[in-house]
Amino acid sequence: MTVETFKPKQTTTLDIPVKTLEAASTNAVTTGNRIGFVSLGCPKNLVDSERILTQLRIDGYEVTNSYDNADLVIVNTCGFIDAAVEESLDAVREALEENGKVIVTGCLGAKENQIREVHPDVLEITGPHSYEAVLKHVHKYVPKPEHNPFTSLIPQTGVKLTPKHYAYLKISEGCDNRCTFCIIPSLRGDLDSRPAGSILDEAKRLVESGVQEILVVSQDTSAYGKDKGGRTDFWNGMPVKQDITSLARQLGKMGAWVRLHYIYPYPWVDDLIPLMAEGLILPYLDIPMQHASPRILKMMKRPGRVDRQLEAIQRWREICPDLVIRSTFIVGFPGETEEDFQILLDFLKEARLDRVGCFKYSEVDGAVANTIAELISEEVKEDRYHRFMEVQAEISAERLARFVGRTLDILIDDVDEEGAIGRSFADAPEIDGMVFINGETELEPGMLVRARITHSDEHDLWAEVVDADTQD
């Protein structure tokens, strides 16, 4: 469906089903330097996992897909909301039961006592982006191999947990905003932007390795460079301004799709839209708005001028008619009245957003929002969630129907016996819809094809190939 509740995403090197681990244990073979890895949460956490795994491979460790073959398991946790905490604690429990030697890192790791209360046998716990600490602990329990002749085979892009044709590019860490429902700044700190040259170097390596789509992520992507005080960086001997518009312009020149995620609604977002209209970056804007009631937005410590937001949406679409807007909202925020909720529904009907995610408010330990107003009952939250979903599903169906009859570039993600599955510029991996191309079993993941859209529903598209680019 178009509207989804939050469910932590789990990526793991341990792809043997749990039910087979016990049987496999009798034949397990260990070399003394094998690491298993479980990564939970958002794409930003996935990038952290890739960085840790890359350094482990450089240090000579092997990455295994079996609990039994692992000399140690690392669990990179998520602590965004209570559902994420539960998922993380369950993953730690499974790793302890199936292996016994576990290091915990990530957002939930910032709350060591909470983990120790449930899992006292965990070897070590570190917080988010504590790469060096994680590696130090690994070296302590699984001594670093003396030599690995295959280290030189690690690609320049490092270890990637995504398919080879797309990759996440993290441009900063932390956030300077203090939204009352969020504890990310307390876990990951204030905004810390990467040097532009470093980002562009990584992007170039990704494209040269065959990556067709770069997904730009951070806690607050549109704030990139605010902490740099206007200082420029250098790339290829040329000065580069360190702001999101300048960075996006440079990324757009590399020949891959560039998709921006987690755009806070600052005024200078306007500067990105012409780049989308020019085709430098994808006409796709992931801009979490969270609510539409001025009263609730004020309680959230979010921008509260809905009239300005509607004006901005209209202005953006005039400049870039193909623009796809994704947003997320929270229903059942403490103190939310029926009137507040109706304002939100009215906003949806007027804004006509393309893709929308919906969260039922969840009490996050340490969030200011838990205590600023009366909590909403689960029954009311559930009712509002379903009403929200019903309204947005109709809007999303209408927005997708405009593509029927058009020919679009489709990036192929998967191929099975029924045909190919891909995405258009309107679809980010994992969170948006897909384009189904039935019968095309000769295509391969990573191929870019031209396809005519023949059908749509509220979430997905169906298409027929017009022309295929055989370059992976």
UniProtKB/Swiss-Prot annotation:
The keyword Transmembrane does not apply. Residues 161-398 form the Radical SAM core domain. One of its GO terms (biological process) is tRNA modification. It comes from the Bacteria. Residues 33-143 form the MTTase N-terminal domain. Binds 2 [4Fe-4S] clusters. One cluster is coordinated with 3 cysteines and an exchangeable S-adenosyl-L-methionine. Pfam families: Radical_SAM (PF04055), TRAM_2 (PF18693), UPF0004 (PF00919). It is found in: Cytoplasm. It catalyses: L-aspartate(89)-[ribosomal protein uS12]-hydrogen + (sulfur carrier)-SH + AH2 + 2 S-adenosyl-L-methionine = 3-methylsulfanyl-L-aspartate(89)-[ribosomal protein uS12]-hydrogen + (sulfur carrier)-H + 5'-deoxyadenosine + L-methionine + A + S-adenosyl-L-homocysteine + 2 H(+). Its EC number is 2.8.4.4. InterPro entries: Elp3/MiaA/NifB-like_rSAM (IPR006638), Methylthiotransferase (IPR005839), Methylthiotransferase_CS (IPR020612), Methylthiotransferase_N (IPR013848), Methylthiotransferase_N_sf (IPR038135), NA-bd_OB-fold (IPR012340), Ribosomal_uS12_MeSTrfase_RimO (IPR005840), rSAM (IPR007197). [4Fe-4S] cluster 2 binds at C175, C179, C182. [4Fe-4S] cluster 1 binds at C42, C78, C107. HAMAP family: MTTase_RimO. PANTHER family: RIBOSOMAL PROTEIN S12 METHYLTHIOTRANSFERASE RIMO, RIBOSOMAL PROTEIN US12 METHYLTHIOTRANSFERASE RIMO. Belongs to the methylthiotransferase family. RimO subfamily. This is Ribosomal protein uS12 methylthiotransferase RimO. It comes from Shewanella baltica (strain OS195).
